[in-house]
Design a protein with these regions (language model features):
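C-terminal substrate-recognition "lid" of short-chain dehydrogenase/reductases
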Residues: 140, 221-250
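Alpha-helical segment proximal to the catalytic Tyr-Lys
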Residues: 133, 179-180, 241
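Conserved glycine-rich Rossmann-like NAD(P)H-binding loop of the short-chain dehydrogenase/reductase
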Residues: 28-45
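Catalytic loop of short-chain dehydrogenase/reductase
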Residues: 110, 144-169, 174-175, 179-183, ...
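Canonical Rossmann dinucleotide-binding motif of NAD(H)/NADP(H)-dependent dehydrogenases/reductases
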Residues: 2-33
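Short, small/polar-rich loop/turn modules that mediate ligand/substrate recognition or access, typified
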Residues: 182, 187, 243-245
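Substrate-binding pocket helix/loop in short-chain dehydrogenase/reductase
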Residues: 97-114, 213
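Catalytic Tyr-X3-Lys loop
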Residues: 84, 106-125, 140, 144, ...
């Protein structure tokens, strides 16, 4: 298996971590189906990855829809004839703004709460569900979910009453699937970023916000999207085949 061209689906592929993950996998010659809800950003991803040795196909889809998730898996198999792993990067806070963090409970509507779970948990669940038959048939597959440090503790300015429980659910989903699917040859792991240095973070929240998080790191710097992508790639690639059910914190030493 180590010598064949690997094929992956990356969801949220037009965002910061998702885009960096797609680039990292393509740089090693993999086939990647990049999935995102934004056609415009997918076009930018294609342009950005045009010179990389791997083959990129893109697909616009809302993965909170079961039909869409099933269609994405089917498209990957139709285009590439194979699927080795999925990076479930799609997620985040809904309609994020400068004052999104730690918003009062009274401002958390049920619709927003459910949309946050749909974006973070439903998408990962549905992709795993529809990839399982293919993975089981070949006796091999890898799923990497993206959780957050916000899943583990009360942390100021890292989420809200909808986002933090959703990311905790991603951890629970990861651990449950690893046990349920492991004897079928399917490995399921997750990464847990803290605040990730990206253009969007700096533009949305400003320098003072970034500096407060920077002060809490053990390394004196924040993780970058490329750091998160490297961790995801490690968990997708063959060198991590003995690992399942783990959550890897990629957060510059923040516990």
């Amino acid at each position: 298996m180590n010598n064949e061209t690997r094929t992956y689906i990356v969801t949220g592929a037009a965002g910061g971590i998702g885009g960096a993950t797609a680039r990292r996998l393509l740089a090693k010659g993999a086939n990647v189906l990049g999935v995102d809800i934004s056609a415009r950003r997918l076009e930018a991803l294609q342009a950005n990855c045009a010179e990389l040795p791997g083959k990129l196909e893109v697909c616009r889809a809302d993965l909170s829809s079961e039909e869409a998730a099933q269609g994405v898996v089917e498209k990957c198999l139709a285009v590439f004839g194979e699927l080795h792993g999925i990076a479930n990067v799609a997620g985040g806070m809904v309609d994020i703004e400068a004052d999104s963090m730690d918003r009062p409970l009274a401002q958390i509507g049920l619709d927003y709460f459910r949309r946050t779970f749909a974006l973070n948990v439903d998408t990962a669940f549905l992709m795993a569900k529809h990839a399982e038959p293919h993975f089981e048939a070949k006796g091999y597959g890898k799923i990497v979910n993206v959780a957050s440090l916000a899943a583990f503790a009360n942390r100021h300015e890292l989420g809200d009453t909808a986002y933090n429980p959703a990311k905790a659910a991603v951890v629970g989903l990861t651990q449950t699937l690893s046990l349920l699917l492991g004897r079928k040859g399917i490995r399921v792991n997750a990464i847990a970023p803290g605040l990730v240095m990206s253009d969007k973070v700096q533009e949305t929240f400003g320098k003072a916000y970034v500096d407060r998080h920077l002060a809490a790191t053990a390394l004196g710097k924040l993780a970058r999207v490329e750091d998160e992508a490297e961790a995801i790639a490690f968990l997708l690639e063959p060198q991590s085949d003995a690992i399942s059910g783990e959550v890897l914190r990629v957060a510059a030493g923040v516990r």
